[in-house]
Design a protein with these regions (language model features):
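Extracellular receptor-binding modules and their adjoining Ser/Thr/Gly/Asp/Asn-rich linkers
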Residues: 2-75, 116-133
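Extracellular jelly-roll beta-sandwich "head" domains, especially the C-terminal globular C1q domain
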Residues: 85-133
Length: 133
């Protein structure tokens, strides 16, 4: 086993959409780095706490948000992981939706999600989104 210690990793300009890819000795892709992530407050005035490749969050309506990417992905065929924290005195359970027919379809430059309890959209204090492609 070897240890790789570097300060900078650069993409190969001939690579797919300028993405850093990890490959084995035969050149088979084993993975890529996270393309975008964000942690934001979805209550009151929406505010980004920390992010990578996210330019802004649009507060569409109660419990509905659009994450806008700083640099668009090559297409909308990415995987999204979303978590949220919602609590009130009567309902501790919530769910997250991002493939809801009531929401705007994902694009290469944005991703819309909703947080809710039962069938009602609710704002969440902590929402995290991770995008892989």
């Amino acid at each position: 086993m070897s240890t790789l210690k570097v300060n900078t990793v650069q993409h190969n300009t001939s690579g797919f959409n300028n993405v850093v890819q990890f490959t084995d000795g035969a050149g088979t892709e084993n993975g890529t780095l996270c393309r975008a992530w964000v942690n934001f407050n979805g209550t009151g005035t929406v505010a980004i706490r920390a992010d990578f490749n996210v330019s802004s969050i649009t507060d569409i309506a109660l419990g509905q948000y659009t994450v806008n990417f700083s640099n668009a992905l090559s297409d909308a065929n990415y995987a999204a992981v979303v978590t949220s924290y919602y609590t009130n005195a009567t309902n501790q359970n919530g769910y997250i939706s991002y493939e809801d027919s009531r929401l705007k379809a994902r694009t290469s430059s944005s991703f819309t999600l909703a947080t809710s309890t039962t069938s009602v959209y609710n704002d969440s204090a902590i929402i995290s989104v991770i995008i892989h492609r």
